[in-house]
Amino acid sequence: SKPTLLFVGRITRQKGLPYLLKALHLISKDIQVVLCAGAPDTPEIAEEVKIAFAKLDEERGNIVWIEEMLPKPELNALEHGCDAFICPSIYEPLGIVNLEAMACGLPVVASATGGIPEVVVDGETGYLVPIDQLHDGTGTPTDPDKFVHDMAAAIDKIMADPELAKKMGQAGYE
């Protein structure tokens, strides 16, 4: 069984899914990825994500897109079957989704923005991906390529060490 990374969220600019889809091109092809992503807030981002996913699926495989928001029991079962959680948000006041993943014993790789650093302890319960952002209210990274590369590196790091991932997941659960 391959190590599995999970993303759960709506398809919005704030959730950072387009950056994640770029980062996934850079990670080990041995990592299976599950995207539980639905409810796009605009037709434009829906199309952007659809095109990016198709390209990613063609180039690397090992990726599944569940295009609906799952009921809580199904989502919990999915989380328990994964090895790590990714939260690439560029705007996130708190990030309840990270707490939910941690409650399932998953280590979290997340953007160091908003309230996320209050939840994810870098190096203990997961990894925080540094992000310098424009101050225009959008949360857009000032250096998108660096953000994407740093995210990919953090994903590879946590997925390459199952024992560390389990330890971080346990620390987050506690």
Task: List where the protein language model places each region.
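A conserved mid-protein helix/loop that constitutes part of the nucleotide-sugar donor-binding site
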Residues: 3, 12-26
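A structural motif in glycosyltransferase catalytic domains
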Residues: 5, 20-21, 33, 151
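Nucleotide-activated donor-binding/catalytic signature segment of Leloir-type glycosyltransferases, i.e.
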Residues: 35-37, 46-69, 73
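Short alpha-helical donor nucleotide-sugar binding micro-motif in glycosyltransferases
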Residues: 76-82
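Aromatic "clamp/platform" in nucleotide-sugar-dependent glycosyltransferases that forms part
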Residues: 90
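Short glycine/serine-rich donor-binding loops of glycosyltransferases
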Residues: 95-98, 116
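Short hydrophobic beta-strand element within catalytic cores of glycosyltransferases
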Residues: 107-110, 120, 127-128
